[in-house]
């Protein structure tokens, strides 16, 4: 009887994980879900200082690419010496990531420019779902309804069949096709989030600090998936590996 009960509990836990990994979406911008959190938005605006949204880059200066492939081991390979990387310094530890600028130059250049300009400084992970992903990058409203790209406007998806939403990959959140801004998410699902492929731009992956990602994903949240205690991005450091 105890074995049967344990098996049932294990099955229910497995179903919970599959639900988290298979039925969620990653959104940014105004949605029904984030609109209902308006009171929380006002509180965040009092606690955090919104950054300017003026353009930092001319999107026409970024050379886009087509049909570029990446190595099969891109999600596990260490960065090469001299390669540009980012260290996301959070209140819970550091997350180090490398970029897929060869297939996602628009997303990569925007992220780097925003980080260098300090627009991600003192922002929060506003949406956290364990066994799915952690989301951040709203530097104006701090609740998932704001932020702007380094181009001062939305930019197109950069989708490649060679870059998938595997565990540890970093991708742009959006409010629909070609609506990328400043918000990004880190895939944390242990079984990968391949069903998101084709709808979101994967532009990097974590090479060190997934233990921090897991810790952030495990914090207590409210009904809007916002951490009860803010998880803060202190700043994002761009440097050579």
Predicted features, each with a name:
Residues 1-4:
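Positively charged n-region of N-terminal signal peptides that target proteins for export
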Residues 6-13:
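Sec-dependent N-terminal signal peptides
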Residues 14-15, 138:
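Hydrophobic alpha-helical membrane context
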Residues 16-20:
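C-terminal motif of bacterial Sec signal peptides marking the signal peptidase cleavage site
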Residues 21-241:
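Cyclophilin-like peptidyl-prolyl cis-trans isomerases
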């Amino acid at each position: 009887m105890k074995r049967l009960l344990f098996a049932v509990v294990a099955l229910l836990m497995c179903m919970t994980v599959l639900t988290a990994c298979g039925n969620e979406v990653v959104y940014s911008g105004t949605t029904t879900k984030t609109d209902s959190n308006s009171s929380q938005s006002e509180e965040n605006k009092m606690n955090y200082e919104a950054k300017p949204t003026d353009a930092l880059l001319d999107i026409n200066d970024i050379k886009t690419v087509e049909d570029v492939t990446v190595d099969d081991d891109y999600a596990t390979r260490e960065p090469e010496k001299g390669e540009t990387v980012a260290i996301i310094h959070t209140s819970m530890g550091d997350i180090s990531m490398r970029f897929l600028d060869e297939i996602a130059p628009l997303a990569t250049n925007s992220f780097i420019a925003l980080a260098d300009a300090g627009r991600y400084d003192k922002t929060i992970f506003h949406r956290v779902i364990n066994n799915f992903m952690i989301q951040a990058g709203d530097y104006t409203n701090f609740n998932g309804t704001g932020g702007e790209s380094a181009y001062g406007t939305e930019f197109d998806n950069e989708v490649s069949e060679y870059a998938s939403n595997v565990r540890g990959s970093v991708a742009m959140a959006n409010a629909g096709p070609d609506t990328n801004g400043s918000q990004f998410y880190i895939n944390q699902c242990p079984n990968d989030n391949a069903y998101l492929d084709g709808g979101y731009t994967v532009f990097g992956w974590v090479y060190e600090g997934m233990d921090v990602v897991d810790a952030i994903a495990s914090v207590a949240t409210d009904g809007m998936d916002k951490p009860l205690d803010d998880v803060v991005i202190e700043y994002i450091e761009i440097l050579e590996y």
